[in-house]
Each structure stands twice: as C-alpha cells, then as structure tokens.
Amino acid sequence: MASKTLLLLGLFAFLFIVSEMAAAGTVKSESEETVKPEQHGGGFGDNGGGRYQGGGGHGGHGGGGYQGGGGRYQGGGGRQGGGGSYCRHGCCYKGYHGCSRCCSYAGEAVQTQSGH
C-alpha cells in the first residue's frame, strides 16, 4: 500500500515538473517574439506594409505600428488622425516626415545619435 502511494506521489511530481517546463517554454517563446519587433516588413505603408505584426508603418490609410493600430503603439492615430508618434526607446532614424524608425532598445538611440 505504501509503495502505491509513493508511486502515485512520484507520478504527480513528474507531471508537475513537466507542466512547469512546458509553461516556461511558452513564456520564453512569447518573450522572444516581442524581442524581434520588425518581423513583417515595412516602411511608411499607406495601405498595409509597416512594422510589428502587419500594421501599416506611419499610418496613411491602413494603420501602423503595433498590431494594426493607427500610429505606433496600439491604436494611436498616426499621421492623419492625430496621436501615436511616440517611440519608447527613442527615434533611430528621422526621415522627411519625422521619425521613420523607432529604436528597439535604449542603447541603440545613443549609438545612433553619436554617429551624426
């Protein structure tokens, strides 16, 4: 009887460890996804294009920024329509109409500015 209990306890411990490892792998893959922001080609994109999961650049007609929002960062309004031209880590390339590319980390802005 004690061996059955010990066996069941060991089985539950094994399942717990496996589920924790699987959950940690899921969290790691999601964080890697956010580290690589420019996966879906881009630029200014009047009707599509753009950065960050298919959004449309600076937002002419089709939105922009993150996940299809209007400017940069979830729903801001891009150029025509106000709002949204903020770069979390600073602007790494300024074009004719303002910031064309946001920096992916804070140190990149410092490196870019020292080159000018």
Swiss-Prot record:
Q: Name one GO cellular component term.
A: extracellular region
Q: Which UniProt keywords apply?
A: Extracellular matrix, Repeat, Secreted, Signal
**Comp. bias intervals (Gly residues):** 40-83
- What are the subcellular locations of this protein? Secreted, Extracellular space, Extracellular matrix
Q: Where is the composition biased (Basic and acidic residues)?
A: 29-39
Task: Show the segment(s) annotated as Disordered.
Answer: 27-83
Signal peptide residues on this chain, from the entry's feature table: 1-24
| Transmembrane helix recorded as keyword | no
Superkingdom: Eukaryota
Q: Which Pfam families match?
A: GRP (PF07172)
Q: Do the record's keywords include Repeat?
A: yes
Q: Residues annotated as region 5 X 6 AA tandem repeats of G-G-G-G-[HYRS]-[GYQ]?
A: 54-86
sequence repeats: which residues?
54-59, 62-67, 68-73, 75-80, 81-86
| Stored InterPro entries | GRP
Q: How would you summarize the oligomeric state and partners of this protein?
A: Interacts with WAK1 (via the extracellular domain). Component of a 500 kDa complex, composed of GRP3 or GRP3-S, WAK1 and KAPP.
Stored PANTHER family: GLYCINE-RICH PROTEIN (PTHR37389:SF32), NODULIN-24 (PTHR37389)
Q: Which family does it belong to?
A: Belongs to the GRP family.
Function per UniProt: Regulates the function of the receptor protein kinase WAK1.
**Other observations noted:** GRP3 and GRP3S bind to WAK1, WAK3 and WAK5, but GRP2, GRP4,GRP6, GRP7 and GRP8 did not bind to any of the WAK isoforms.
Descriptive protein name: Glycine-rich protein 3 short isoform
Q: Which organism is it from?
A: Arabidopsis thaliana (Mouse-ear cress)
Name of the gene: GRP3S
